[in-house]
């Protein structure tokens, strides 16, 4: 009898069957799943893009993205990359399948791929089904670290608004605030930082870092990490490079604002783990610095200068600090307070320190004493040597090179608020050997301009351009006090650097120890006589210009063996120098311009080192005998001198083998004029040339012939001449010519030589009654054939009282730099060489000024577009520009003695 039994196989078989079905479905349904994955991913990306657009609108309203939205967006970004990888492998994987997907050439590989596609499809579907009722909320202020802030600086409100609006522009990723020390850069940066506590504007984090003078990358990394809540042993044990990479990857997922206060050199954002701000990531970096060079190196397109306060704003800040009790304690104190405030020159740091000191001074005498101290030696004023000057000295210390530092200190030799010509400064520096002039004057001057540029960009000098085109610099009064303080060894050796300029001195001041004096400036005083002997064994510079000097004793210069620079210019009653000047064996610079000097001093030939001699505007000079003995002379300036040139003078000057720069005024009718103009040696040196005829005598020759060697000529003036032609050499070039002035040249008919002056910036032509063409077409044939386009750098064109002038040029010119055309008294000038594209465009675009409305209405324009451009705003500027034109005529008349 057998035993029978049964095993329940059905459940097991079902499970195995389901498992096999699922495995097979990964490959069997692969193509269908891939299509679904691609479609669903496209829908997810569209949903993501819609959400991002909504978020942009919300962020612009000052709202902040919710955390769950950020998480969802990060997941979409991650899964998009993985889906792309799967879809990129699609063709290869489908080719492996056979038997309608029930089998594969590589079953394991196809199974894994099919499973990945299936699972990724489920993830994408889940993300795509997500619905968000709310995507943003009011921005949290917890990520903004408010900085302690002194009361807002009076007058900086507009600057704050401008800075904020500029920073919020989409195209601005990095903004630099620059300016001199103590001007309020950090205060302004703090105000911008604290403004984010009210308006986050969609930023996730606002980070503030103070950068030390010596950049420490690791310290900055740690500080930024702390601000974004990265800390712990894992961070601390990372190397500097690892910290940078980690922080970079962390910050690139955020929208941040980074404030870097007080940087002195370029900060490499990559090194400190900061992604560079772009339009795409919408991050911002804002920094303060004293150097414009730093702004440039950081990639700032439009640096914002933080300037000193205007007078009214400065006084408002000053009186607010002093307080009404003190100001009201005596009626005179309020008036004196304006004088004291003005001494601070709008510098907030100085205004704060000085006002705090004066807030308890309630007698008129105390205020008068304060003014005296600030005028005589401000470093002694309370708070100056410990709160103001040391802070400014950081800028001085950061200058690269002792020569640059010395050049800054030299600027302090001039009076307060002095406008200093750049060329004068550079000449002093060369002759003091601060700048090496051994390789030529041009190279030394270029170095001088580079130094001035570096001082301007370091916010230590201020740059201006005068109406006559002169380039000048100014020294802020507080910076000047700092320079004097440094030059006197921080106040320990006041007699080493004596500056008593423009203080009303009537005699040489008393000095305890003349042997320590290195530089002395007594310019612009009332010292009629220099008597006795000064034992100044270390003196290298002595500036005595414009001191009403009449006489110098014979022994005055006997003990100045190191004197290199002596400026006696502007002393109109000084008619001779003592023979003792021969004792100045180290003298390299002697300026006798605008003096009453009649002849060169007898001892001049002993000055073997003299390289600069200035005799400009010497109306009494009758002899230059002996000048050929100055074998090392490189620069001789005679412009405006009434000295009558002759053949002997030409020969003497030609004997100066080292001469590089010459400026002069010559009479059109003197015997030596033609010889001078034909001297290739002298013409190769000429930098300024003025030809005039004030005697009304007729010249033997009717033309002036210019040689081909005038490549140094920068300014050319012709006055009251009977010349009918300015003739050029065949291959003539005036490559350095910047300014040309012609007046009362009544026989001149054209100025075609100007075609060969590619760098000409200013052209004034006045009262030349027979002038018909500026550039004559027939005579310009060779230049036109060579492809020369005239006036590529012309900035100003002034044409006055030219009755016969018909043409400037016969066809439209680009004039890419032209800003002004002033026309008056030119009735026959019926067409201007302009088209609608000519001249500068934009804010400083070309304008045409005139006095006669009848003339401008008769002008024949190139086309309607040209007419529209230059006449569109005529009514808005004609009356004011008529006045401006009159001013120019007045200036020109003074210049040309009309």
UniProtKB/Swiss-Prot annotation:
Stored InterPro entries: Apaf_helical, LRR_dom_sf, LRR_R13L4/SHOC2-like, NB-ARC, P-loop_NTPase, Plant_NBS-LRR, WH-like_DNA-bd_sf
Binding site for ATP: 179-186
Gene Ontology biological process terms from the UniProt entry: defense response
Coiled-coil stretches noted in the UniProt entry, renumbered to this chain: 24-88
Domain NB-ARC residue range list: 137-440
GO molecular function: ADP binding; ATP binding
A Pfam family it matches: LRR_14
LRR repeat start-end pairs: 516-537, 538-559, 562-584, 586-608, 609-631, 632-654
Keywords assigned by UniProt, alphabetized: ATP-binding, Coiled coil, Leucine-rich repeat, Nucleotide-binding, Plant defense, Repeat
Recorded superkingdom: Eukaryota
SUPFAM superfamilies, per the entry: L domain-like, P-loop containing nucleoside triphosphate hydrolases
Record remark on domains: The LRR repeats probably act as specificity determinant of pathogen recognition.
Family to which the UniProt record says this protein belongs: Belongs to the disease resistance NB-LRR family.
Function summary: Potential disease resistance protein.
Protein name listed in UniProt: Putative disease resistance protein At1g63350
Organism listed in the record: Arabidopsis thaliana
Record lineage: Eukaryota, Viridiplantae, Streptophyta, Embryophyta, Tracheophyta
